[in-house]
């Protein structure tokens, strides 16, 4: 974290194992605390404070406010320290404060109390300044105060918000600090609010990339993870989703309607209407439309994977092309090679996967089946429609198909009365 806390504790309840595993992934040093009975925010803080040092300040955040910026929290912490507060709460003014606790201020403008909506009168519900669930407390004071909490409220829970009025009544200095951007403080309680927050985060991320020199044609339909790295002068077309450890080099064009997950894209590459994951796309390579690039694939510079091509765990050499309607699995393809339309790399025997090796400057004829394990030497050809089951030496052509036989008059004898038979008769065909 940019805030560099001395210790990080996360209180978990529902779906404990899933949450704990995720916390370990993103913050291995964080300590998780289990709240078996959900007795309110005050109870959660009681559990988190156990065995925590009594010195310094503690920052408390809600787990459902993911839009908070570290800069906002830094300013909040600095204001708390500068004013030597015992307790501070971050607030926001919302267009619709429904569902949030209200901030009650005195005539002097200072905070008097925080009242949860279920406990608020109609007069208090008219207040649009709300509690964001972000606090800073002096640890020693907080430890004492949370032990005094009671359940005298509509939900029968221990409210952390009651600590503010308690500290105030005991002469401690408390403050409500207003956030300038209320969207940072939005909470998530349902799928609608989740979608709203996701859209805000999307816009933030896209704005950052655009200001750094990335062209995003339609930011509202372009979704980019925070983990993605994009160099300047990249163009992203509508309907694109970039996730994971994806890195895109300068001059590349991505989309429209393209998904990249953990993909390294080198300079000047072009990927259109395709799905690519855990792969590497070389400089000036072309992918799509409608290509499916699966994990373990490496496309060298100036290579091409075209329309309706699926590639899995394969390396395609510099300048090589798989232009149309093919499946390439577990293959090594050299440079300057062309794979004809409808070629299938038959890599699976029902039990194990096998590798196919294709050399440099090879020409694979359309509708060829390469039954692995098999290899095709440099400069070799395969005849269209062949089923290749044996290695082809360099410079040879592999022909593996039955000889064509024309049976004259078959349509007239076997399909009499059909349109085909009528056309054949007009063309001079006979039954003999």
Task: Kindly give the residue locations of the regions a language model identified.
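Residue-level signal for inorganic ion chemistry
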Residues: 8-10, 48, 64, 103, ...
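Residues that recognize and position ribonucleotide moieties
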Residues: 66, 128, 135, 157, ...
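Glycine-rich hexapeptide-repeat left-handed beta-helix
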Residues: 270-432
């Amino acid at each position: 974290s940019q805030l560099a806390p001395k210790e990080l504790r996360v209180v978990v309840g529902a779906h404990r194992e899933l949450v704990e595993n995720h916390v370990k992934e993103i913050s291995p040093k964080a300590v998780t605390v289990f709240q078996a009975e959900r007795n309110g925010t005050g109870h959660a803080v009681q559990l988190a404070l156990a065995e925590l040092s009594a010195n310094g300040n503690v920052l408390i955040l809600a787990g459902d406010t993911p839009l908070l910026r570290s800069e906002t929290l830094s300013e909040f912490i600095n204001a708390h320290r500068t004013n030597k507060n015992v307790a501070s709460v971050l607030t926001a003014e919302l267009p619709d404060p429904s569902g949030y606790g209200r901030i009650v201020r005195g005539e002097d403008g200072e905070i008097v109390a925080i009242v949860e909506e279920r406990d608020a009168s109609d007069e208090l519900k008219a207040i649009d300044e709300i509690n964001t669930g972000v606090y800073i407390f002096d640890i020693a004071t907080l430890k004492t105060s949370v032990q005094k909490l009671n359940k005298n409220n509509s939900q029968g829970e221990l409210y952390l918000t009651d600590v503010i009025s308690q500290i105030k009544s005991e002469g401690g200095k408390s403050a409500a600090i207003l956030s300038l951007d209320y969207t940072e403080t939005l909470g998530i309680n349902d799928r609608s609010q989740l979608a709203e927050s996701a859209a805000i985060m999307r816009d933030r991320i896209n704005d950052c990339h655009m200001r750094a020199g990335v062209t995003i044609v339609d930011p509202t339909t372009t979704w980019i993870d925070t983990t993605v790295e994009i160099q300047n002068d990249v163009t992203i077309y509508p309907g694109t989703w970039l996730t994971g450890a994806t890195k895109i080099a300068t001059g590349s064009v991505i989309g429209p309607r393209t998904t990249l997950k953990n993909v390294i894209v080198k300079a000047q590459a072009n990927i259109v209407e395709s799905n690519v994951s855990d792969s590497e796309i070389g400089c000036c390579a072309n992918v799509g439309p409608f290509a499916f690039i699966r994990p373990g694939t490496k496309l060298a510079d100036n290579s091409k994977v075209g329309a309706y091509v699926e590639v899995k765990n394969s390396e395609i050499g510099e300048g090589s092309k798989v232009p149309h309607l093919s499946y390439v699995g577990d293959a090594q393809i050299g440079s300057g090679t062309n794979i004809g339309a409808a070629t299938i790399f038959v890599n699976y025997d029902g039990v194990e996967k096998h590798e196919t090796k294709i050399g440099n400057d090879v020409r694979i004829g359309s509708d060829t089946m390469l039954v692995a394990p098999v290899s095709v030497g440099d400069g070799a050809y395969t005849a269209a429609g062949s089923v290749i089951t044996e290695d082809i030496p360099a410079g040879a052509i592999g022909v593996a198909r039955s000889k064509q036989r024309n049976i004259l008059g078959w349509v007239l004898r076997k399909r009499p009365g059909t349109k085909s038979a009528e056309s054949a008769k007009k063309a001079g065909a006979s039954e003999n």
